[in-house]
Amino acid sequence: MKDLLKFLKAQTKTEEFDAIKIALASPDMIRSWSFGEVKKPETINYRTFKPERDGLFCARIFGPVKDYECLCGKYKRLKHRGVICEKCGVEVTQTKVRRERMGHIELASPTAHIWFLKSLPSRIGLLLDMPLRDIERVLYFESYVVIEGGMTNLERQQILTEEQYLDALEEFGDEFDAKMGAEAIQALLKSMDLEQECEQLREELNETNSETKRKKLTKRIKLLEAFVQSGNKPEWMILTVLPVLPPDLRPLVPLDGGRFATSDLNDLYRRVINRNNRLKRLLDLAAPDIIVRNEKRMLQEAVDALLDNGRRGRAITGSNKRPLKSLADMIKGKQGRFRQNLLGKRVDYSGRSVITVGPYLRLHQCGLPKKMALELFKPFIYGKLELRGLATTIKAAKKMVEREEAVVWDILDEVIREHPVLLNRAPTLHRLGIQAFEPVLIEGKAIQLHPLVCAAYNADFDGDQMAVHVPLTLEAQLEARALMMSTNNILSPANGEPIIVPSQDVVLGLYYMTRDCVNAKGEGMVLTGPKEAERLYRSGLASLHARVKVRITEYEKDANGELVAKTSLKDTTVGRAILWMIVPKGLPYTIVNQALGKKAISKMLNTCYRILGLKPTVIFADQIMYTGFAYAARSGASVGIDDMVIPEKKHEIISEAEAEVAEIQEQFQSGLVTAGERYNKVIDIWAAANDRVSKAMMDNLQTETVINRDGQEEKQVSFNSIYMMADSGARGSAAQIRQLAGMRGLMAKPDGSIIETPITANFREGLNVLQYFISTHGARKGLADTALKTANSGYLTRRLVDVAQDLVVTEDDCGTHEGIMMTPVIEGGDVKEPLRDRVLGRVTAEDVLKPGTADILVPRNTLLHEQWCDLLEENSVDAVKVRSVVSCDTDFGVCAHCYGRDLARGHIINKGEAIGVIAAQSIGEPGTQLTMRTFHIGGAASRAAAESSIQVKNKGSIKLSNVKSVVNSSGKLVITSRNTELKLIDEFGRTKESYKVPYGAVLAKGDGEQVAGGETVANWDPHTMPVITEVSGFVRFTDMIDGQTITRQTDELTGLSSLVVLDSAERTAGGKDLRPALKIVDAQGNDVLIPGTDMPAQYFLPGKAIVQLEDGVQISSGDTLARIPQESGGTKDITGGLPRVADLFEARRPKEPAILAEISGIVSFGKETKGKRRLVITPVDGSDPYEEMIPKWRQLNVFEGERVERGDVISDGPEAPHDILRLRGVHAVTRYIVNEVQDVYRLQGVKINDKHIEVIVRQMLRKATIVNAGSSDFLEGEQVEYSRVKIANRELEANGKVGATYSRDLLGITKASLATESFISAASFQETTRVLTEAAVAGKRDELRGLKENVIVGRLIPAGTGYAYHQDRMRRRAAGEAPAAPQVTAEDASASLAELLNAGLGGSDNE
């Protein structure tokens, strides 16, 4: 019994470990793993099905085929355990050792490991400092390499061809040593003295100045140091012993009909063994050199194919022309070991079925079909049956359940009570895609789902399926109940707003019951309370919409949080009074005393949650749903063709538009406008007409005229069903109604350009053939887009999760005073996002002062909740500095104060929360949503008429920033700068509106002038970009040669002619290098200088520019010299948006980025070269000037002599985030990325909290490049984890030494994921081979800090409920205790023993 216990203990023991190290395996190490050498290529005997001895499946090496039974059958049963049979040499033990015992093959000639050879950069090549081509020629026996030059003139590592080798032999005899093949490379690697080489390289590094050389040297130094420190020996990159995978991991399965299905690895191993044995035989026979050489090359190729098939040369294919799967393919890719088996596994105890509506369920319930429940809860039922004594054995219990006896259903009811199940809908895009519910048993076969959780699951009932999982252990049930229950997930983690929001029918019902109607039955009554209102409605004495007075009792919370009653008479309607009956105490009556649309209902739930907390909100949400469904049914709202009222004005509007189009067409034919301008204008006309039709239609639908009690006519909001559905937010939008009853509008072609003839018909009138045909474009594009975008969005989410997965809240407060300034987002005349929305739930980084005083309004380190935000609004604060994860000082994680509020829970975030994953999901989930939604409007082009003026909305004074302007002949200002901003300032000095003013705009009011609301302050032509002269004089053409750089277009009708500049592609060879330009000269023909500079005024013209002046014309400043047609706008939707988000997170450089000033100083222009100008910035303090060559075609925003600050825009274009980081710092780049990403999502109406984007930015900024190493042991130019540098510098400064200086790096999310400290995480993401090769050479240790690594090694993750376990392990390790081994009690032992004996007796159950 005692040794049996020991045996059991050995099985249950789990290894405790803190880190995983990867390294190269030495030949001795491979031999130590092995249980014997595989000598023959045979697998199994096809007649007896027994494995061949010494073959690939040999039982003597790898273990017995059957449990506790040797191959020849001499020893069977458990009692002979551990005996080695003297006849067949097999150890009697369990079969599962065939999954863990390895073998080996002794290679007759060394072979190079292809990963270290071909995985770029080639490690062997880098170590030997030889080109890969040369090494390959040596390895594959094409040339010789000199290993020892001796006294000859041959260098070590010199490559010799066959002839050169023979010549050298004749000349020097055996003075020198040269070889070919892997043994040569092995000899070279063996003879390297790494430490000496390292010293030598460091000396070289200090002497050299060339950038490329330095890079190469540092690379080599890093590799050599890695070898020295990790204890790897270079020659181990050449294999002399090949390990053989355990046979059960490369199985051979007999199919019916005597054929076998086998793993590709067996074929690959067979080739290696065959070639190896042949080579041994040839060597024994002392065969001619050329034959041996050929065999060695073939062996090298066979080993290559086994390790990584297809990496070099053509992939080896099997019988069916498909490349064989090598060892490398087994671990990489979606089907590889990491992603298929380690990161996600299939689970037991799960089922799936179609979902249907469960409108009578409570929020925490789901309907589970009895059949499913019976199957899922089987183990619990068996246990209960035995416990009750209703069944004697498990087998008997099994029988009872199979017969479905009556008692089984009773037991099932008991088992299921209070036992939550998890429901999951694929794709699980965010954590709300898996929630826990209590099951309610139902008949039928479909799962019933509560309608309010559909939004979180993004589920609908058109055939969606969901999976059910059963949490088995007590801990799992507890977590499901406490954390995952649907009632605990009312707020969305992405934006902190309720996600349990009624939609569709419920909204329509509530909207219908809270609408009021003129002269409804029972109008003017005074009622004693909601109860009476309901009685009157039920008995038919009053209409739901009747305007009445009702006595209402409200409850308000006082200072102590006690509820105080307050009764008053309210003007309201019957329906609202009835709805008041379900509103929980503590909410004001105003909340229901309005027509409730979807937004109002959401706000109502939000208020309820903030004031009353979780439980009342859940009950309220359920009540809202029941009520909504009931009254939606009563409303009888339905859609009939007569509900689509076509406005009378439609015909008139369309004929006006057609007239305008005809006029433009005429102008085009008479040459007044170009084709491009005509197209743009036509589209604008139709876009405007469309807006007018839809406005007329909405006005028409919106109101109806009724007779009131006094017999007068009165307008009231319409009860048209379609209008009610759209107005309440239940279904449909103005854009969709426009297509039903207005006009379908402009359509887009598949390439995104807009077709200029719109569809003037609507769906009610019906489309003709042409219109229908045009419509198919958009509809088809929508569907095609959807398929593509879903994949792209999923991939974006995967990259985001990967980069942020190890970010967890690890401490309460890091104590930093850093933070980012938050200001409201103002676009045009609207505040797109007020300050309160941006700072809500953040922590202040410094005291917020009352504007204009020194009084502290909000102290530092305050979590800004709703009440604080109200205070900020009352005092009109317009900038607050808040803590941010980007500036958090915690190493390996962030602190709770820098993160702020946990959006899904409404209080400050807890330690151990995996904020990285939440952030990634919050950004990734809407990406997919939006892309799936593109086709709902059916591809109708949604393009606003182009902006052509600025009209302010409020009164105030104008403030212009970064402006340059000239006064034109009529005394107006013309803007000549490119990023001018016009702000409207109110009397308190707050910015109310902000606009971008384009180049060439004419201003009606100047800087500092007062304007009235509704006044137009600037206008411009939206379709062409002018070239404006800043000086007066005469025009002189340069390089404008007809037929070479320009063509003259004369209009037949008007005889007006204009010059069009040719694109360089269209020019003749002679015109390629010419630069057409307009020069301004004075009457004497001398150059006129641009004011304030000593540059002549000449304006280079880009291709397609149109000039309507003649040579020598007189002009005055502010006049237009030429017009450049702008490309017409395409349609805007997230199709452009998703790639934009991906570009931002990948930190890609835009094609032609803006050029920013590298230093502050005065601008001047140096000597020009052919196509470039030389820009020189001279600092004011007299240090070295900075020079940069800029292509001439770039339009510059600066003039000679102008003063620029570091980071100012010199030439327009999209800004590259790397430049912003380098020149303006971390906060600027954070602001840039956050705002740009938010712009894309805001366009789609998706709310995401800024925090989430900041979390990702923090991860993108986690590397730093060492500029100067100081006393640290970093290398200059080395890229290191930012936290590492911080820690090292802290230690150095504590010892009074000089820290390293560094610059922060911005990495794209893919790069950042691959550059993590953890090689396991990186390998399971992408480029598995490269990551593992690099890690093995460097002998990396993975500290298992992140979530992914811990999932892969099969542990609890260091976040959430697993956080405590990890903290505990760290504490124990620090205290130096050994972690307690699992205790085995006698009961456990006997139970395990019984199980083993059963297995032994059954013998057949060994699956």
From Swiss-Prot:
It catalyses: RNA(n) + a ribonucleoside 5'-triphosphate = RNA(n+1) + diphosphate. Binds 1 Mg(2+) ion per subunit. Binds 2 Zn(2+) ions per subunit. Belongs to the RNA polymerase beta' chain family. It comes from the Bacteria. The modification N6-acetyllysine is found at K972. HAMAP family: RNApol_bact_RpoC (MF_01322). InterPro entries: DNA-dir_RpoC_beta_prime, DNA-dir_RpoC_beta_prime_bact, RNA_pol_asu, RNA_pol_N, RNA_pol_Rpb1_1, RNA_pol_Rpb1_3, RNA_pol_Rpb1_3_sf, RNA_pol_Rpb1_4. GO terms for cellular component: DNA-directed RNA polymerase complex. It comes from Escherichia coli O1:K1 / APEC. One of its GO terms (biological process) is DNA-templated transcription. Keywords: Acetylation, DNA-directed RNA polymerase, Magnesium, Metal-binding, Nucleotidyltransferase, Transcription, Transferase, Zinc. PANTHER family: DNA-DIRECTED RNA POLYMERASE, DNA-DIRECTED RNA POLYMERASE SUBUNIT BETA. This is DNA-directed RNA polymerase subunit beta'. DNA-dependent RNA polymerase catalyzes the transcription of DNA into RNA using the four ribonucleoside triphosphates as substrates. The lineage of its organism: Bacteria, Pseudomonadati, Pseudomonadota, Gammaproteobacteria, Enterobacterales. The RNAP catalytic core consists of 2 alpha, 1 beta, 1 beta' and 1 omega subunit. When a sigma factor is associated with the core the holoenzyme is formed, which can initiate transcription.
